[in-house]
Amino acid sequence: MREITPRKIIEMKGKEKIAMITAYDYPSALLADKAGFDIVFVGDSLGMVVYGEPNTLNVSMEQMVFHTRAVARAVKRALVLADMPFGSYEVSVEEGIKNAIKLIQAGADAVKIEGGYDHKKLVKRLVRMGIPVMGHTGLTPQRYLRLGGYRIMGSTEEEVEEIIRDAKALEKAGAFAVVLEFVLADVAKLVTEEVSIPTIGIGSGPYVDGQVLVWHDVLGLYEESPPFVKRYANLRDEILGAISEFKKDVKEGKFPGREHYWEFQDKEEFKRIKESVLRKVD
């Protein structure tokens, strides 16, 4: 069992901020764990930042299992959280249970489900089975078509009511935490005060119990990123510069240099081998 468990995350509420970051492969997960993140999250955002999809709706269970397995191999300390992709739990509770089990068997410590009140039965069943669940309300990318696109949530009484209802339903069903995405900070603060489980924000202000960002956004791997992101590096330019230099060296015959390859020390022996081999294959 890894050091950080759902129980540990619950105990951090109001005491220590929870740090969570996405990772989609072995090397990124290795670094995230070494950096000391509490939660390493295999998000369905991989559809967009890894596979170039316009949204998360086309991410499959097979993709999530594949990437979860890679991340789980790398992480020794942090809690490994895996997303339930669109279509993997909406049809029935039984279907959701089957797919959650696949992610746990791939090495996840917990699963995340978008939505709250509508999926309380599934959350309750999973928790009873021993599968920890994190909920997700506010802007739910898997439902962006219904929401009218990606926009900040919580500006109307109806939206605030829905967000609060979702969070409380998740709490009652046994979820150990809830993500609040792109929610007005006042509303995120209200939710944080109203539930006993930790709230983890993304674009929802400072009044939550923790924060999560996407790996590629933190590192500046794309030209554009969501407006709530703080870039901690601009690796796109650094990577582009490095690979451009490699291409230039290849074109100009500068790579490989003498230190990058090996030759026969005994040239006469190589001459003998060459003549022998060429006679045999002629």
Swiss-Prot record:
Cofactor comment text: Binds 1 Mg(2+) ion per subunit.
GO cellular component: cytoplasm
Domain of life: Archaea
Pathway: Cofactor biosynthesis; coenzyme A biosynthesis
Keyword Lyase: no
Localization (cell): Cytoplasm
Residues the record lists as binding 3-methyl-2-oxobutanoate: 44-45, 83, 112
UniProt binding sites for Mg(2+): 44, 83, 114
Gene Ontology terms, MF aspect: 3-methyl-2-oxobutanoate hydroxymethyltransferase activity; magnesium ion binding
CDD domains in the record: KPHMT-like
InterPro entries the record matches: Pantoate_hydroxy_MeTrfase, Pyrv/PenolPyrv_kinase-like_dom, Pyrv_kinase-like_dom_sf
Cofactor(s) required, per the database record: Mg(2+)
GO biological process: coenzyme A biosynthetic process; pantothenate biosynthetic process
Entry keywords, A to Z: Coenzyme A biosynthesis, Cytoplasm, Magnesium, Metal-binding, Transferase
RNA-binding in keyword set: no
Catalytic activity: 3-methyl-2-oxobutanoate + (6R)-5,10-methylene-5,6,7,8-tetrahydrofolate + H2O = 2-dehydropantoate + (6S)-5,6,7,8-tetrahydrofolate
Record EC number: 2.1.2.11
Residues annotated as catalytic: 181
Pfam family for this entry, one: Pantoate_transf
Quaternary structure (record): Homodecamer; pentamer of dimers.
Protein family per UniProt: Belongs to the PanB family.
Its biological purpose: Catalyzes the reversible reaction in which hydroxymethyl group from 5,10-methylenetetrahydrofolate is transferred onto alpha-ketoisovalerate to form ketopantoate.
Protein name as it appears in the record: 3-methyl-2-oxobutanoate hydroxymethyltransferase
Organism for this UniProt entry: Pyrococcus abyssi (strain GE5 / Orsay)
Gene responsible for this protein: panB
